[in-house]
C-alpha cells in the first residue's frame, strides 16, 4: 500500500512539471507541495502499518497466560477421583501445580462462569440456564450415590420407593422397615449440591425432603451418620468408608460393576465444566485431555468411579 501511494504521488508531480514548464514560481511551489504530500503520505502509511502491528500484538496478548498451574473448583464428591488424577498429572509433568477447591457443584459451576478457575467440577448435569450462559459439560465418570446407615443398624436393603417415603416423612421409624424402634434421623446435603440434586431427582423427592441436617460436604455426611446409630444419609460411593454401611437398593449392592452395568439405579455423572469461547491455558488443556483419555480410566477406577471413556 505504501509503495502504491508513493507511485501515485510521483506521477502527479511529473504531470505538474510537464504542464508547467516555464510557468514560474507558482508551479514550482506546486511540485514542492506534492513532494511534501508524498512525504506526509509515507509517514501516515508508516503509522497505519505500526498501528496494525500493535493491534496484532494486542490480539496475541489475549491468549491466556500459562503459569504452569491447573485450577479446579467444585464438587466435594469428586475429591477422591480428581485428587488422584491431579497427583498423577503432576508426577508426569515436572513443574506443574494442580489445585482443587472443594466448594460444591454449584459453586464450582459459578467459578467457571466468572472466570475464577480453569475447570469446574460438578456431580450433576448442567441445567438449561447454565448451558445458556455458555457453559459446556464433559462427562468424566459415573458414580453411585450410596444410601448409608450406621453400622449398628440392622436394615440392609431398601428400595427406591421406600427411600423416598423415608425422606419425605411418610415413614419415620426404623421398625417400619425392619429395624429397631427408633426415629429415623434424616441427613442430607445443602441446596446446590450435585449429590443432593442427583439423589432427589432419582427418588422423585425434589423440594420434599424433611432433612434434620443439611451438610456442606460428603465427608460431613459420612461422619454424622457414623456417629448417630439412627441416622440415614447419602454419599458418593467413591468416598464411602467402613465407618458407615451402604445398604443395597432393590437388592442390588452399590459397586463399580453395578454402576457400570446400570443395575444400581441411584447414580449420577461426574462432570468437567468449561466455558465456550474461553481458551484453556496449554497446561490446563493438557490436563483436560489427559483426564478424559483412556489412560486415566484405571486411576478413576481405583478411586471408586467408572470412567466414561
Which residues does each predicted region cover?
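C-terminal motif of bacterial Sec signal peptides marking the signal peptidase cleavage site
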Residues: 16-20
Amino acid at each position: 500500500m505504501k509503495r502504491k501511494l508513493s507511485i501515485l504521488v510521483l506521477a502527479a508531480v511529473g504531470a505538474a512539471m510537464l504542464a508547467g514548464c516555464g510557468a514560474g514560481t507558482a508551479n514550482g511551489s506546486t511540485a514542492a507541495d506534492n513532494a511534501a504530500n508524498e512525504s506526509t503520505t509515507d509517514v501516515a502509511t508508516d503509522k497505519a502499518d505500526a498501528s496494525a502491528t500493535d493491534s496484532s500484538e494486542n490480539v496475541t496478548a489475549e491468549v491466556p497466560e500459562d503459569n504452569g498451574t491447573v485450577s479446579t473448583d467444585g464438587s466435594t464428591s469428586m475429591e477422591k477421583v480428581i485428587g488422584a488424577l491431579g497427583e498423577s498429572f503432576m508426577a508426569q509433568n515436572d513443574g506443574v501445580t494442580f489445585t482443587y477447591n472443594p466448594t460444591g457443584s454449584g459453586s464450582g459451576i459459578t467459578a467457571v462462569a466468572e472466570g475464577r478457575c480453569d475447570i469446574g467440577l460438578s456431580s450433576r448435569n448442567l441445567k438449561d440456564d447454565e448451558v445458556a450462559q455458555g457453559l459446556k459439560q464433559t462427562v468424566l465418570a459415573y458414580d453411585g450415590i450410596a444410601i448409608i446407615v450406621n453400622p449398628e443398624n440392622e436394615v440392609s436393603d431398601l428400595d427406591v420407593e421406600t427411600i423416598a417415603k423415608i425422606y419425605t416423612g411418610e415413614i419415620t421409624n426404623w421398625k417400619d422397615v425392619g429395624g429397631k424402634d427408633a426415629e429415623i434421623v434424616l441427613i442430607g446435603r445443602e441446596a446446590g449440591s450435585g449429590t443432593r440434586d442427583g439423589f432427589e431427582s432419582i427418588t422423585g423427592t425434589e423440594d420434599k425432603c424433611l432433612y434434620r441436617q443439611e451438610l456442606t460436604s460428603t465427608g460431613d455426611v459420612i461422619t454424622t451418620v457414623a456417629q448417630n446409630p439412627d441416622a440415614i444419609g447419602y454419599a458418593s460411593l467413591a468416598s464411602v468408608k467402613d465407618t458407615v454401611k451402604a445398604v443395597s437398593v432393590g437388592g442390588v449392592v452399590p459397586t463399580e460393576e453395578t454402576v457400570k452395568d446400570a443395575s444400581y439405579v441411584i447414580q449420577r455423572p461426574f462432570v468437567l465444566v468449561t466455558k465456550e469461547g474461553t481458551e484453556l491455558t496449554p497446561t490446563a488443556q493438557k490436563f483436560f485431555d489427559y483426564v478424559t483419555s483412556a489412560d486415566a480410566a484405571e486411576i478413576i477406577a481405583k478411586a471408586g468411579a467408572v470412567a466414561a471413556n
